[in-house]
Amino acid sequence: PACRRLRALLQRSLDPAQRRADPENQVDGFLGEGLPEGARLWSKAGWMSQARHDAAWWQLPDQSPTLLVVFSSGPDRAKDEQLLPALAKALSGFSG
């Protein structure tokens, strides 16, 4: 079905080697970067000179899924590659 195809398009690898091979991986600088490697991640990120956004759904082993959507604006936030990973890392620490 269509939902299976969409999930396949949005699934992101947290494997460092795969991320290095794809400089536009939608993990580094976004929510997925803040997750532990064992997490399963589906996301859609966006970045422009005036904005950095991400919508991510992830699941850690033996935990309920988490959905986080972050919109930011302004050139300083758009260049900030640590804000979104820090938010995901903090939130994933409260999951479970």
Language-model segment annotations:
Residues 1-96:
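Penicillin-recognizing serine hydrolase domain
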